[in-house]
Regions:
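Soluble, acidic/polar mature domains that operate outside membranes
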Residues: 1-295
Length: 295
């Protein structure tokens, strides 16, 4: 489902939402490329003006079936069938009911994995929309407190940031806000793949609960957003949001245990933030000295 952010404003760009096989915000870069490649398809050669013999060209059961619906309700169906050789594919459409070929490289954006079409961030939460976050990371409990209003800088004096009740407004020797670094790790959890047939029924191993502020714009009350993780195998975890399976999973290492510098998992990142709080001098922690290894 592709729709303009504001149908009355052509300059507003496009907002993309997928409804099948999963309901997710779309990746605007990939889907813009997909849409442009479809709209700009041009025939290399005309093969048959009679489009009744679809089976001969692999178009009766096409590799790809693309349905475009305009804002006025007009529908165009595009079928992409067998290879025609020479780097081309057979194509037909309801807009031009004939058999033609198109260049295969014009269809690059059509043949991508599902992960490329979706917004891969599990829950990208703006910091000013959140009042607190409860973390249960494999049994390790933490509580984040946030007092940031839209338009404020995280370094403003009136902003309060806490980890388990401690002042967490710690900066590095270069001025980097270490709470902000941790928060980016928290909201930066990314989808690793899809398992649409799964029905996770194992125990929840980790949980992230965001408490969201009331939103006057949408007239919504304060509410909780609960993200839960259930082990899929030794390497990945299913993701549930507000108790419902999302259809996707994440890398356990990337999400929780990675010690790679700049790509730390949550268990490592929260330990580093606590270490910085414990060893900061006048609110400054020298990250160049490093952190202790996390066992």
């Amino acid at each position: 489902n592709l729709q303009p952010s504001d149908p009355a404003d052509e300059a507003a760009g496009l907002a993309f939402n997928l409804t099948q096989p999963v309901a997710r915000p779309g990746n605007p870069d990939t889907l813009t490329s997909l849409l442009n490649s479809i709209l700009n398809l041009s025939a290399v050669r005309m093969v048959d003006l009679d489009a009744s013999n679809l089976e001969r060209y692999g178009l009766a059961q096409p590799k790809y079936l693309l349905e475009l619906v305009t804002l006025t309700g007009k529908e165009v169906l595009i079928r992409i069938g067998d290879s025609a050789g020479n780097g081309q594919y057979y194509v037909t459409s309801t807009a031009l009911p004939a058999i033609m070929t198109v260049q295969a490289d014009a269809l690059t954006a059509v043949d991508l994995p599902l992960t490329d079409y979706v917004d891969r961030f599990v829950a990208l939460m703006s910091i000013w929309k959140v009042s607190s976050v409860s973390l249960d990371l494999e049994g390790e409990q933490h509580e984040l407190g946030l007092s940031v209003e839209e338009g404020q800088k995280i370094t403003d004096e009136t902003v309060e940031l806490t980890l388990d009740g401690q002042d967490a407004k710690i900066i590095s020797q270069s001025g980097e806000n270490l709470f902000s670094t941790f928060y980016q790790t928290l909201i930066g959890i990314r989808i690793d793949g899809f398992d649409l047939a799964a029905s996770p029924d194992g125990p929840v191993t980790s949980r992230i609960t965001y408490t969201l502020k009331p939103d006057p714009a949408s007239q919504s009350d304060a509410k909780a957003l609960v993200i839960e993780f259930v082990s899929r195998d030794a390497y990945t975890d299913y993701v549930l949001i507000d108790g419902s399976y999302t259809g996707f999973y994440v890398s356990h290492r990337d999400t929780f245990t990675s010690g790679q510098v700049g790509q730390e998992g949550l268990l490592v990142a929260v330990s580093q933030l606590q270490y910085a709080i414990d060893h900061a001098v006048d609110g400054v922690f020298d990250t160049s000295k490093g952190y202790p290894a996390i066992s």
